[in-house]
Amino acid sequence: MGLSSDSPVRVEWIAAVTFAAGTAALGYLAYKKFYAKESRTKAMVNLQIQKDNPKVVHAFDMEDLGDKAVYCRCWRSKKFPFCDGAHIKHNEETGDNVGPLIIKKKET
């Protein structure tokens, strides 16, 4: 039972199924490229620090810093806002590469 010009319905059906499958494949690839990555990168960064505040902000006067200050950027420090090295474990567990913010006086 082969295709012939006598069966236009069968040829149209095959063309429609082929087009639908191609469209579905392109749609799936576009979804994987643009939307699947977004959903896994929108994880909560701050898991426990001042969760009752709408925004966590710390301000320090430059005179109060001394010669050097090291601040946490991974939100895992037990001494937050200061760094205690918790980013090392965080980086090992998540594959992240976050490190501390180091502020020091300019050497003259």
UniProtKB/Swiss-Prot annotation:
Binds 1 [2Fe-2S] cluster per subunit. The [2Fe-2S] cluster is redox-active and pH labile and is significantly less stable at pH 4.5 as compared with pH 7.0. There is a cross-link at residues 42, 55, 68, 78-79, 89, 104-106 (Glycyl lysine isopeptide (Lys-Gly) (interchain with G-Cter in ubiquitin)). It comes from the Eukaryota. InterPro entries: CISD1/2, FeS-contain_CDGSH-typ, FeS-contain_mitoNEET_N, MitoNEET_CISD. The active site is at 55 (schiff-base intermediate with pyridoxal 5'-phosphate). GO terms for cellular component: cytoplasmic side of mitochondrial outer membrane; mitochondrial outer membrane; mitochondrion. GO terms for molecular function: 2 iron, 2 sulfur cluster binding; identical protein binding; L-cysteine transaminase activity; metal ion binding; protein homodimerization activity; pyridoxal phosphate binding. Its cofactor is [2Fe-2S] cluster; pyridoxal 5'-phosphate. The modification N6-acetyllysine is found at residues 55, 68, 104. It holds the Pfam family zf-CDGSH. Coiled coil: none annotated. It is an enzyme of class 2 (transferase). Keywords: 2Fe-2S, Acetylation, Iron, Iron-sulfur, Isopeptide bond, Membrane, Metal-binding, Mitochondrion, Mitochondrion outer membrane, Schiff base, Signal-anchor, Transferase, Transmembrane, Transmembrane helix, Ubl conjugation. Residues 32-108 are cytoplasmic. GO terms for biological process: intracellular iron ion homeostasis; protein maturation; regulation of autophagy; regulation of cellular respiration. The chain crosses the membrane at residues 13-31. L-cysteine transaminase that catalyzes the reversible transfer of the amino group from L-cysteine to the alpha-keto acid 2-oxoglutarate to respectively form 2-oxo-3-sulfanylpropanoate and L-glutamate. The catalytic cycle occurs in the presence of pyridoxal 5'-phosphate (PLP) cofactor that facilitates transamination by initially forming an internal aldimine with the epsilon-amino group of active site Lys-55 residue on the enzyme (PLP-enzyme aldimine), subsequently displaced by formation of an external aldimine with the substrate amino group (PLP-L-cysteine aldimine). This is CDGSH iron-sulfur domain-containing protein 1.
